[in-house]
A protein has these predicted regions:
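Hydrophobic acceptor-binding patch used for acceptor engagement in glycosyltransferases
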Residues: 24, 138-140, 170-171, 191
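Nucleotide-sugar-dependent
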Residues: 76-79, 127-131, 139-162, 171-183
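Carbohydrate-associated surface elements
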Residues: 30, 48-49
């Protein structure tokens, strides 16, 4: 009962705030469209940017690809990472998914116990994230599938997507299509995306063995990064929103 009271109070407060003339800035189109439609706004999307420098195209080395994930492993992401590791093991028993995370709780880390194909590497500073991203052949973007996790990540879009795209590595996304990051990955056309566990191994094989797919993703990724994840572009959109609001005062 308290949840519903707080939810109704929150909705009333949000509607009161948005009843005033103004605009809004969002981190993704999905939440932009929802709020603009609900509150009659003309808000703009300012995507997260990245400091990682793009490296030249590199074909994925089939015999020993460096596969990495950086970030939070809660909200079902640990389960999805374990599933990716299992699928990699079926493709080649020597393949390893390196997972870098600040997580300390064994409740979330323990799922990797006994896996020959997932290595939990612990925490690394952002400078190392940039270095290891540049060294990786495949970077993973992942979300969970359970409703309780999807409800939290439905509109989220983390820095992992911007960093992965900016690096120049091949990017593989896996999770529910209802999650913001996965929906975005699927929509931009330069990230190999899987939203069905039954297709996971097939999707990974396609990325690892199809050089033409890797090239297409790399080249399309250049355009996506330039349009969506460059600081100059994001700054320009932000300034246009602020100037528009100030001009209406």
């Amino acid at each position: 009962p308290l949840y519903h009271i707080y939810k109704l109070s929150y909705r009333r407060l949000i509607r009161k705030v948005f009843s005033h003339k103004g605009s809004a800035i969002y981190i993704g189109n999905k939440i932009r469209d929802k709020y603009n439609e609900s509150f009659g706004l003309d808000g703009k999307t300012v995507y997260l940017t990245s400091e990682i420098k793009r490296h030249p195209f590199r074909e994925i080395p089939v015999r020993s690809p460096v596969i990495s994930y950086f970030g939070n492993i809660r909200l079902g992401r640990n389960e999805s990472l374990r599933e990716i590791g299992d699928a990699l093991g079926r493709i080649d028993s020597s393949y390893i998914l390196n997972v870098y995370s600040n997580e300390k709780d064994e409740h979330y880390i323990g799922i990797f116990d006994g896996s020959r194909n997932v290595k939990f590497c612990g925490t690394v500073p952002y400078s190392e994230v940039m270095k290891k991203s540049a060294e990786s052949d495949i970077l993973i973007v992942v979300e969970g599938f359970k409703k309780k996790d999807v409800d939290i990540t439905r509109y989220s879009l983390s820095t992992k997507v911007a960093d992965s795209l900016s690096s120049g590595a091949a990017v593989f996304a896996y999770g529910s299509a209802e999650c913001g990051a996965i929906e975005y990955a699927e929509s931009i056309g330069c990230i190999t995306t899987c939203t069905d566990k039954d297709m996971l191994e097939v999707s990974l094989r396609s990325l690892i063995y199809d050089t033409e797919l890797q090239i297409r993703n790399y080249e399309k990724g250049i355009t996506v990064v330039e349009n969506n994840h460059r600081l100059e572009n994001s700054t320009g959109i932000f300034e246009s929103v602020v100037n528009g609001v100030c001009g209406d005062l």
